[in-house]
Amino acid sequence: MSHQKILILDFGSQVSQLIARRVREQHVYCELHPYDVSEAFIRDFKPQGIILSGGPNSVYEAVDWRAPQVVFELGVPVLGICYGMQTMAEQLGGKVESSAKREFGYAELRARGHSKLFQGIEDRTNAEGHGLLDVWMSHGDKVTELPAGFKVIGSNESCPVAAMADEERGFYGVQFHPEVTHTIKGKEMLARFVHEICGCGNDWNMPDYISEAVEKIRAQVGDEEVILGLSGGVDSSVAAALIHRAIGDQLTCVFVDNGLLRLNEGAQVMETFNRSLGVKVIHVDATEQFMGHLKGVSDPEQKRKIIGREFVEVFQAEAAKLPKARWLAQGTIYPDVIESAGAKTGKAHAIKSHHNVGGLPETLNLKLLEPLRDLFKDEVRELGVALGLPHDMVYRHPFPGPGLGVRILGEVKKEFADLLRRADAIFIDELRAADWYDKTSQAFAVFLPVKSVGVMGDGRTYEYVVALRAVQTQDFMTAHWAELPHSLLGKVSNRIINEVRGINRVVYDISGKPPATIEWE
């Protein structure tokens, strides 16, 4: 099936991925590519419309950072955002200059000219009945002369050309960022652009994607066998379910229990995949191997390297027992592809395969199968539900690759891991029971390698401490600590201290990101 597509050209904005996510939310397929792709690529892509992203440069300084001229010659609508609007203006004969007043943050915009982009979209009206929009600005330059054929469709006191349009050609520019949630009606503006201005339908949906992906996997793999490292995380789980839907028993999954998983995670993975879905899963208990190599190691980076190295060793050993395997499957998703493509310039450049299991494809001499590489995380979750995976598995919070290895501060010991996984399970159980789990973006317990004095019954105790961490965030770049009810925290603390022998104190982390990170290590 051939989809109607939007092409997004990336000029290095911090939020370019958000543009793509917002377009996909409209059930319209899009791809994000560096701004300097070739004319041939753009023509072959056959876009219904093109979006030019923001970026950190000034058009009068960065003379090489231009949209290919073919963008304005294809006869399709174009939307320029921030820098994208400025390069559109400059390339089409307008003028851009440094602004005496820079704008960073919320701004109020007056819509003008009854443009198709803003028609009927407003946050409120002023006394004269003019539509007003609350938008998010981030710019130090401004358009001072419009290109021929353009009119002003939005302005404010500090930015007289805050939005512009040549409606005859379908060219629009906005100085603000409609892709961020701070622009209240940004979603409606992007929907208006892709559906009404570009004429895209709603032909990007999961049922169709499953059918297409299954056909593609079958054509790619043929009758050869595939091996996949199953972690129990969302991406590898959905990849396994999709590949199994396509090729059945040609897929073998290897699930490595390194002793650093969540409570009962191994049993849950085997129950879901092996018994419920009928996927072939090899369950390897490598706890002793991992713990042996982690003994005496306290540095977090060293722990990460050891856990990664040992996973590769275990996986290689199991792969060697499957000589017919010709493909290595991975749960690479679209943000991985974009991030691994990032060049020093900050733009998504030279996109290549993202090996999220370090070194395995080269070492094993296997071909790489990445069936999720076109999907964002929210789309992966939607796909997982459509494939029949349990909702709790698909919508569980992120879990670090090294597992509890980086949630046990300092040296990792089996005793510490056992205490931590039980405390963590209590925290998660109570969050679910209180209907707080889905209100937090990530929640977990951390084991602190210190002891504190306590009193239990008539006796003095000297036992370990755990910290609880829960955050709320939209993008994980910044995060606010979750303001959980004190009664809930009290219940969690009481259960942990009473049910997990060896812990006598529970603390709650109220640090935001920044200055703290979400994980402790």
Curated annotation (Swiss-Prot):
<keyword id="KW-0658">Purine biosynthesis</keyword>
<dbReference type="GO" id="GO:0005829">
    <property type="term" value="C:cytosol"/>
</dbReference>
<dbReference type="InterPro" id="IPR014729">
    <property type="entry name" value="Rossmann-like_a/b/a_fold"/>
</dbReference>
<dbReference type="InterPro" id="IPR004739">
    <property type="entry name" value="GMP_synth_GATase"/>
</dbReference>
<dbReference type="Pfam" id="PF00117">
    <property type="entry name" value="GATase"/>
</dbReference>
<feature type="active site" description="Nucleophile">
    <location>
        <position position="82"/>
    </location>
</feature>
<keyword id="KW-0332">GMP biosynthesis</keyword>
<comment type="subunit">
    <text>Homodimer.</text>
</comment>
<dbReference type="InterPro" id="IPR017926">
    <property type="entry name" value="GATASE"/>
</dbReference>
<feature type="binding site">
    <location>
        <begin position="231"/>
        <end position="237"/>
    </location>
    <ligand>
        <name>ATP</name>
    </ligand>
</feature>
<feature type="active site">
    <location>
        <position position="179"/>
    </location>
</feature>
<dbReference type="Pfam" id="PF02540">
    <property type="entry name" value="NAD_synthase"/>
</dbReference>
<protein>
    <recommendedName>
        <fullName>GMP synthase [glutamine-hydrolyzing]</fullName>
        <ecNumber>6.3.5.2</ecNumber>
    </recommendedName>
</protein>
<feature type="domain" description="GMPS ATP-PPase">
    <location>
        <begin position="204"/>
        <end position="396"/>
    </location>
</feature>
<keyword id="KW-0315">Glutamine amidotransferase</keyword>
<feature type="domain" description="Glutamine amidotransferase type-1">
    <location>
        <begin position="5"/>
        <end position="203"/>
    </location>
</feature>
<keyword id="KW-0547">Nucleotide-binding</keyword>
<keyword id="KW-0436">Ligase</keyword>
<comment type="pathway">
    <text>Purine metabolism; GMP biosynthesis; GMP from XMP (L-Gln route): step 1/1.</text>
</comment>
<keyword id="KW-0067">ATP-binding</keyword>
<dbReference type="InterPro" id="IPR022310">
    <property type="entry name" value="NAD/GMP_synthase"/>
</dbReference>
<dbReference type="InterPro" id="IPR001674">
    <property type="entry name" value="GMP_synth_C"/>
</dbReference>
<comment type="function">
    <text>Catalyzes the synthesis of GMP from XMP.</text>
</comment>
<dbReference type="Pfam" id="PF00958">
    <property type="entry name" value="GMP_synt_C"/>
</dbReference>
<dbReference type="InterPro" id="IPR025777">
    <property type="entry name" value="GMPS_ATP_PPase_dom"/>
</dbReference>
<dbReference type="InterPro" id="IPR029062">
    <property type="entry name" value="Class_I_gatase-like"/>
</dbReference>
<dbReference type="InterPro" id="IPR022955">
    <property type="entry name" value="GMP_synthase"/>
</dbReference>
<feature type="active site">
    <location>
        <position position="177"/>
    </location>
</feature>
<dbReference type="GO" id="GO:0003921">
    <property type="term" value="F:GMP synthase activity"/>
</dbReference>
<dbReference type="GO" id="GO:0005524">
    <property type="term" value="F:ATP binding"/>
</dbReference>
